[in-house]
């Protein structure tokens, strides 16, 4: 049966008679194999509809429909373990494992998680969100079950983009050392979020160019045949051994494929046959991201994720302020035009980090190193050693993966590397796996490193210039999404290192005084809360935009301390070990004995919701800030 090709996202729930009867994979396994193509088509229609209702990851899910059906049909889940690397592609898995009716809540507050989550379902065997962890986790499960003498099949589904990370190969190397019973399904769609880059992508292309398929018979025996996608040519006279040679075999895995990842019945044959073999096995399949939805097949990058469909409004659309990532991208181009020493590095996040324009304008100065955060940081260090000025664009949550390199390879040598740290703070619907909640804590203990946090998009631009001009490692940490709508100054101006600015004084003549030290994205809401407090309680309040987490402006704290009855620190970061902790440390060192209230993210992983909901939930919106300060202030007043 040919695959259906859809051109529009349905706004009405599709008719899915087979899918409606599947609330557990056991019900799927009771169907005839000949019915699986219809199940896959119904599942694709339902994913299209559900994504239109809720938004979320899109193209990757459409690309693994047939694979997901085949896996749950062949393997005894949840006894057998399926581990989805990253988890962008797990929506069909969630539908087939009893969460069909909840799928429209995905990524919403109190809804399904954006990625597989152990607390959500017994079928979600490992919590994911970051790349390239599945093989390590799967190997751990396989070895544990061997030790417990309770074996099961463990299948890790990994994309070609995730396979570029060193962690994946570390795990494969170890799997061979232990001769582990482990299956790795390489889902090759020539895409991560951006296009796959580097030698590994070329290696996969070379496997294709051989024109050979390593197939498997019903007894689990491998044999080589001409690939059905290729016409006969002289290359097919290579020996079977030479034809099958590739990196995976060199490591020690049995290699099979490449197979059509959209041929569900052949995938069932392959998986059933592979269950008759033991040891490390890699199954190479090729899929198309966005399969079955014509616009996504044509433009998989744009359709990596979508927003939910909303009713058309006749009201004019208000233009949003630029995103911080776009402000970064424009600064990068402007700075590069003035200094040919600037080189830019990204670990596979060109689009998300706002670097598309730079990559087109300066291709020889742009380096997409694939999903390799450790390498990205040390690559920058090497460039800096040769007198160049590299800029690393990286999400806060992913810089965690390059922490040793940040310390050992950059800061210890005091190298001139600039870090543009995107997605700092809470990130809304992607939930705790992608939150940038810990960067102050893991960076501010590092000697030589300057850390800045802008209050708005214009200050972000000027801080990036300041960091770039600084002779040493410097980081600018900015949030996801749009700025505040302030005017962006085109001229690049350096800020004084370690110097804060006073942005608001309410009733400065009053003796009773609160000083708010705000960092980054919380400056504007701190000002809003301060004005409300000053009006309600007739007290003096000063709000300071601290700008620098390190070095801290100790002078302004010291100057304000004499007339301050309460210090308040506010940050969109974990309150433990964050910027507020840096203020506490200084106050203790200077023996300034003043009550201090630290506001930030609580010591818990914040559940997914919209960014606005998350801020409200942890008391970091203007109303929550006002209430927290008011409670402590009234206690101080009553004690006097």
From Swiss-Prot:
Instruction: Name a GO molecular-function annotation.
Output: thiamine pyrophosphate binding
Q: Which UniProt keywords apply?
A: Isoprene biosynthesis, Magnesium, Metal-binding, Thiamine biosynthesis, Thiamine pyrophosphate, Transferase
**Residues given in the record as thiamine diphosphate binding sites:** 88, 129-131, 161-162, 189, 293, 373
- Pfam hit, one: Transket_pyr
Tell me which CDD domains the record gives: TPP_DXS, TPP_PYR_DXS_TK_like
The pathway noted for it is:
Metabolic intermediate biosynthesis; 1-deoxy-D-xylulose 5-phosphate biosynthesis; 1-deoxy-D-xylulose 5-phosphate from D-glyceraldehyde 3-phosphate and pyruvate: step 1/1
**What does the cofactor field's note say?**
Binds 1 Mg(2+) ion per subunit.
Tell me which cofactor or cofactors this protein depends on: Mg(2+); thiamine diphosphate
Leader sequence segment: none
Q: HAMAP family given for it?
A: DXP_synth (MF_00315)
Q: What does this protein do?
A: Catalyzes the acyloin condensation reaction between C atoms 2 and 3 of pyruvate and glyceraldehyde 3-phosphate to yield 1-deoxy-D-xylulose-5-phosphate (DXP).
PANTHER family noted in UniProt: 1-D-DEOXYXYLULOSE 5-PHOSPHATE SYNTHASE-RELATED, 1-DEOXY-D-XYLULOSE-5-PHOSPHATE SYNTHASE, CHLOROPLASTIC
Recorded protein name is: 1-deoxy-D-xylulose-5-phosphate synthase
> What is the native source organism of this protein?
Acinetobacter baylyi (strain ATCC 33305 / BD413 / ADP1)
